[in-house]
Amino acid sequence: MKALRIVLAATALLSFVAAPLFAAEPGTWKLRAGVGTVAPESSNLTTDLGNDTLVIDVDDGTALTLSATYMITEHWAFDILAASPFSHDINARVIASVDPGFSPNSFKVAETKHLPPTFSFQYHFIPDGTIQPFVGLGLNWTTFFDTKIDPALAAGGITDLKLDDSFGIAAQLGADWMLNDNWLINVDVRWINIETDAALSGPAFAPATSVDIGTVAIDPWVYAINVGYSF
């Protein structure tokens, strides 16, 4: 009898230890808000400029981020990422063909803003743990707006920069740290395929109305830290 009580007590203890601490059941929502930084590739575009080479660089941008995750099953989820507009300076360098080793300081071409809504399916490895890591894969749509040419270029007759919308894949790696049944801290890293066709226009290109300068491969890493609520 004593041995039976010990076995039952041990079984109960093991059941308690193995019980889910913060189970993310199907139908659970996780809402997160925080700060994200978009870090584009350096040297996003290299194109010929007569006998020289033009190199375009896009600076980092930081903005508020929002995401909503819906648990379809204990492991599979659907995630939507939104954000306030990210702002970027677009700079250029001209590498002279007569001296390829010489590259002067970059000069500002324009500034622009973009919104990067992203839709992903996620797989959560430990949906009932205190730390809940996950991976995601999905699609991104990026739209550019409020693009402004630098006044120095505008004075020279280059008055507009057009950036087309972009559609591409997005990959994600992240984790939720469950503080209790509801509140959590989240960190995630995303790589997003963003490529946009760019064109300059203005009186400087007369009689042409615009000049295509190529495809700008932004392809940023996005780093974010968020506070979230699960219900």
Predicted regions and their residues:
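Predominantly the C-terminal beta-signal and adjacent terminal strand-loop region
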Residues: 87-91, 99-102, 180-231
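Short sequence motifs at beta-strands and strand-loop junctions characteristic
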Residues: 56-62, 109-116, 161-168, 215-220
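Bacterial N-terminal signal peptides
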Residues: 8-17
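Gram-negative (and chloroplast) outer-membrane scaffold detector with strong preference
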Residues: 25-28, 37-39, 67-152, 218-231
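Extracellular loop and loop/strand-boundary signature of outer-membrane beta-barrel proteins
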Residues: 50-55, 102-110, 155-161, 209-215
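Outer-membrane beta-barrel translocator domains and adjoining extracellular loop/strand segments
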Residues: 43-50, 90-98, 145-156, 198-206
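Sec/Tat signal peptide C-region and signal peptidase I cleavage site
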Residues: 19-23
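Surface-exposed strand-loop-strand hairpins of Gram-negative outer-membrane beta-barrel proteins
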Residues: 40-64, 157, 161-165
